[in-house]
Amino acid sequence: DWSSDVCSSDLDRGVLPYTHPSIQKLNTFVVAAQETDSTKVFLDGSITCGYLNVLPPILLVDRARLVSATNNQTKWFALNRVCESQVRALISATIMPDGSIVGERNTVYSGQFAGRHRKRMNAAKDSTAFITDLETEDDFKILQYQQDSKEDFNSQIREKISFTKQASATDEYIYINPMVFKHISTNPYMQ
């Protein structure tokens, strides 16, 4: 068992050079720890809704240097391969004759997305305000809301929503957007 610093540079400040290491290029670090079964975990103390191997996007560099005085180890790590962050959603819905969509959405947030979801929930005044924000954002009505692992120190959150949503209808036609819920609302590459 050991722990050590992994020194790196934020994504917005450039990469660490291979050929001429320089302390001036270092501007941040995360802690690496190895358990008895040789599994390495990485921790960042700067985020409030973090977990083992869940690092903020700005630290997901492809070149970070492990520096260990006790083991005399120095090696490169790709921190962008440490965690798997994703949102998996399964929607099962029925279109009713009146043009409404009634269904259930099961979502699993993992990694950074679980942290963002926790942060969003903590920012809401209470659970009613959180549900109202969800309804307003995607223009639907939540009939039942259930969630697991909200308070746990866990890299995943499971969410189950029973919902109804009104589709656009004219005299004889019902117009349905196949994207019942927005998968992206803002461009993440815009600053």
Predicted feature descriptions by range:
Residues 2-6:
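Single conserved hydrophobic/aromatic residue that forms the stacking wall/gate
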Residues 7-191:
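A sensor for short, sequence-defined functional sites
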